[in-house]
């Protein structure tokens, strides 16, 4: 959704999903710190791809946290539907956002080059 309304919907859904994850999800598998970086809602409002950054001790903890989010998708969808007034509530699809990890890796490479 590239138009102004689409951007507003993306931002509103991002804000609400972030709040729901922070305050209402009580899954014990969700041990990683979760940050919702971006949301892309399709034009027909059927799907919302939610990109999350997971800060965890190891990869196993990240995987468990992502599984917990995916299993909570129905609850999150219902809560978003109650908070955001849309024609239809989009189905929530979680994707891991590795952009922060990639940026840190590139920065470490640049620091190594700088040292040489």
Curated annotation (Swiss-Prot):
A Pfam cross-reference name: RBFA
Highest taxon, organism lineage: Bacteria
Gene Ontology molecular functions: ribosomal small subunit binding
Keywords, ordered alphabetically: Cytoplasm, Ribosome biogenesis
Keyword Cytoplasm found: yes
UniProt cross-references to Gene3D superfamilies, sorted A to Z: 3.30.300.20
PROSITE patterns, sorted: RBFA (PS01319)
Predominant location category: cytoplasm
rRNA processing in keyword set: no
Subcellular location: Cytoplasm
Record GO biological process: maturation of SSU-rRNA
Biological role stated in the UniProt entry: One of several proteins that assist in the late maturation steps of the functional core of the 30S ribosomal subunit. Associates with free 30S ribosomal subunits (but not with 30S subunits that are part of 70S ribosomes or polysomes). Required for efficient processing of 16S rRNA. May interact with the 5'-terminal helix region of 16S rRNA.
Subunit structure: Monomer. Binds 30S ribosomal subunits, but not 50S ribosomal subunits or 70S ribosomes.
Family that this chain belongs to: Belongs to the RbfA family.
Official protein name in the record: Ribosome-binding factor A
Natural source organism: Clostridium perfringens (strain 13 / Type A)
Phylogenetic placement of the source organism: Bacteria, Bacillati, Bacillota, Clostridia, Eubacteriales
Gene that encodes the chain: rbfA
